[in-house]
Design a protein with these regions (language model features):
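Terminal presequence/propeptide segments associated with secretion/organelle targeting
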Residues: 17-453
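Bacterial N-terminal signal peptides
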Residues: 5-16
């Protein structure tokens, strides 16, 4: 049984770009001019869509790094002031928060340390000069376990350290910390990822699949809001979304800068897949939860305002006013024993790996919601209808499944084959539009046995 997952994106509305807006690069301060002891302000959203300011002091410039953040130098800084006291320091979702010294942009908050008791005030920033390269060309590949070196020791989380390891996997962070020398700290990207609408079992499968990529999944946090999207500015909260509708998967980051209709966000990669086609959405922040081991933003994602087209090591880049390509998934489940009908609809980013991963989980969630249970004996009659550009007519496939233990999982097996045909077809290039999954469930066993031949 292949365990797979689904990401969603639905087109609600698209904010039009401002007519005649100048594509002007902000005033920047090169990293060579940034010195320890310099102070400045950063911008982020901690409630609604209002951009607030925090204060920071540069502690050091870390050298010779790499890894998930594709820069060989990072800025070590201390966050302070009323906003820092309110949030408990840095929080997941603040990635991309622009940081200025004397009105000049130096970079974006990108990573926080794995464990700081009390106030999480020490963090890392990606230099803006490395981020701007993402608008023009890919970042170079980096090593698996980078180590940045400080010019002098610093106290972080009660430890005196002069080396920092950056890992994309928050699940590994504390384990790495325990096995590293006492003078080495561990930091992870400050991003929050949430899912909504999946069944508990489907969500566990998704978490297991995404754990190697460093996504720490928060189930049930976030959602869609009907709020009006405000014009973006440095410090605005935005959403990155791969699945949208009755099932959702995405995250919240912060805008570092906006140049014409192009935006830079996060200061680190999402999945580091290079050329991509994710949805860029409006976002509002409900609150910042001060939790251990790290605080995180809880927010809502709104209308689609553009597309994320670059997912690189130093930043994520997007274009306002363009729509991502979407693959529609509709699942209808009828329980013949109870007469109940359950329907889920979602839009998935039209990437073959994402559609193949997420679509079966949408179907699994619908079946488990219809039966109000995970697993169990039963028969499923499944009808798949696939539409795609390049096909003379829709492809329809009907099949029957029976299981003594888990009819829900058995019933989604054909979905994988349908997606293989749609996205991995060697004979003809197809552009899949949608897949409809109609499932009829019953407890009655409808099988036969050959008794003689």
């Amino acid at each position: 049984v292949k365990r797979v997952v689904v990401l969603l994106v639905a087109v609600l509305a698209m904010a039009a770009p401002v007519v005649g807006e100048a594509a002007q690069t902000p005033a920047i301060m090169p990293l060579a001019e940034v010195r320890p002891g310099m102070r400045g302000i950063g911008k982020t959203v901690v409630f609604g869509q209002r951009v607030d300011e925090f204060r920071f002091e540069v502690l050091d410039i870390l050298q010779s790094g790499g890894g998930p953040i594709g820069s060989d130098k990072l800025i070590l800084f201390r966050m302070f002031g009323p906003l820092a006291e309110r949030t408990g320091g840095t929080a997941a979702g603040m990635s991309g928060s622009p940081m200025y010294i004397n009105g000049r942009l130096i970079g974006a908050l990108s990573a926080a340390f794995a464990w700081q008791a009390g106030q999480r005030d020490i963090a890392l920033a990606t230099p803006i000069q490395d981020m701007l390269k993402v608008l023009d060309r890919p970042s170079r590949p980096t090593s698996a376990l980078p180590t940045y070196h400080a010019s002098r020791p610093h106290v972080i989380g009660g430890r005196v350290v002069d080396r920092v390891v950056v890992t994309a996997d928050p699940f590994r962070a504390l384990g790495l910390l325990a096995g590293l020398p006492a003078n080495t700290a561990v930091a992870t990207p400050a991003v929050v990822t949430f899912t909504r609408g999946l069944s508990p079992r489907a969500n566990r499968i998704l978490a297991n699949l995404l754990e190697p990529k460093g996504h720490e999944i928060l189930q049930g946090h976030g959602g869609r809001g009907d709020f009006a999207a405000r014009p973006l500015e440095p410090g605005s909260s935005v959403g990155i979304q791969e699945v949208r509708g009755d099932v959702e998967f995405g995250g919240i980051c912060t805008v570092t800068t906006k140049i014409g209709n192009r935006v830079l966000v996060c200061g680190h990669p999402w999945e580091n897949l290079g050329d991509v086609d994710y949805a860029l959405t409006a976002s509002e922040v409900v609150t910042v939860v001060r939790a251990l081991p790290r605080p995180f933003k809880v927010g809502n994602l709104g209308q689609i305002i553009g597309v994320i087209d670059q997912d690189r090591g130093t930043a994520i880049a997007g274009t306002l006013g363009r729509l991502p390509r979407l693959f529609n998934v509709r699942v209808v489940v009828t329980d013949q024993d109870t007469g109940s009908r359950t329907e889920l609809g979602a839009q998935v980013v039209r990437r073959r790996d994402l559609a193949r991963a997420f679509t079966p989980l949408i179907a699994l969630s619908a079946i488990e919601r219809a039966r109000n249970q995970a697993g169990g004996e039963g028969t499923a009659i499944v009808k798949l209808t696939l539409r795609a550009k390049g096909l003379p007519a829709p492809i329809v496939r009907e099949n029957m499944f029976y299981s003594t233990q888990d009819v829900a999982t058995a019933s989604v097996l054909d979905i994988v084959d349908a997606l293989e045909l749609a996205f991995y077809n060697d004979l003809r290039a197809l552009e899949p539009y949608d897949l409809t999954v109609e499932t009829v469930l019953m407890k009655r066993r409808m099988t036969a046995s050959i008794v003689d031949a």
